[in-house]
Amino acid sequence: MPRKAKEYPEEGEFVVATVKNIHPYGAFLTLDEYPGKEGFMHISEVAPTWVKNIRDYLKEGQKIVAKVIRVDPEKGHIDLSLKRVNQQQRKAKLQEYKRAQKAENLLKMAAEKLGKDFETAWREVWVPLEEEYGEVYAAFEDAAQNGMDVLKGLISDEWIEALKPIIEAYVEIPTVTIDAEFEITVPKPNGIEIIKEALIKARDRANQEKDIEVKFSYQGAPRYRIDITAPDYYKAEEVLEDIAEEILRVIKEAGGEATLIRKEKRIKKVKKRGS
């Protein structure tokens, strides 16, 4: 079970918790990511409406995502809320927790290769990477995308060498794909050739950039679709802006007209493409 590097959660943090004991006035929960720590959820923090029977909402052994609303390390008190967690926040936290579980499994593989126990791995790798990146899997993604050298100075070369083949084999790089459409007309006998040449040049130039993939597809005159895949949304937007500027310039110089129509973005993951 993945655990945080810090001893206590912070106020406002979302945590994965397991219901331990239920009482008429509230419930005690163990914090999965903070071994040995328990939190209390008053019945007024269970649901936004009046709760007659807390057991209609919570069951012993149930795992939930809760929000930390108060922390007193001196007294060891942690107050939790369920009603202050919306569906989007719950989904994001569970995704983060799954990423931590995957990072833990990968680190265990590396520890086994080196003949070290997980406590040593947690201390020598997990703690420094979490402190630097906020989550360990984000560090692994950075290494997968930009090379293992990004971890130098954070963990030892011994760990870097052990993790390298594991990260290459198992870590996926998140990418964002955005799509848009161009409406292009060039009222000349060779108008189609002018449009085709403009699109090919823009595509080939963009594809020379690292981790960028641009595809055009014909949607039926005068519409042309573009799909841009990049490491993040901002880079995809930057590429689209550059391509649009180039296409609009070329088409205008040829005496035609071009209009960019925005569409949507999609997030996907791809396996690392070598190191």
Curated annotation (Swiss-Prot):
GO molecular function, one term: RNA binding
Pfam family, one: S1
Alphabetical UniProt keywords: Initiation factor, Protein biosynthesis, RNA-binding
Domain of life assignment: Archaea
Matching InterPro entries: NA-bd_OB-fold, S1_domain, S1_IF2_alpha, TIF2_asu_arc, TIF2_asu_C, TIF2_asu_middle_sf, TIF_2_asu
Alphabetical GO biological process terms: translational initiation
Residue span, S1 motif domain: 12-83
Gene3D superfamilies with a match to the protein in the record: EIF_2_alpha, Nucleic acid-binding proteins, Translation initiation factor 2, subunit 1, domain 2
Stretch forming the signal peptide: none
Function: eIF-2 functions in the early steps of protein synthesis by forming a ternary complex with GTP and initiator tRNA.
NCBIfam families: PRK03987.1-1, PRK03987.1-4, PRK03987.1-6
Subunit structure: Heterotrimer composed of an alpha, a beta and a gamma chain.
Family label: Belongs to the eIF-2-alpha family.
Protein name: Translation initiation factor 2 subunit alpha
The gene coding this protein: eif2a
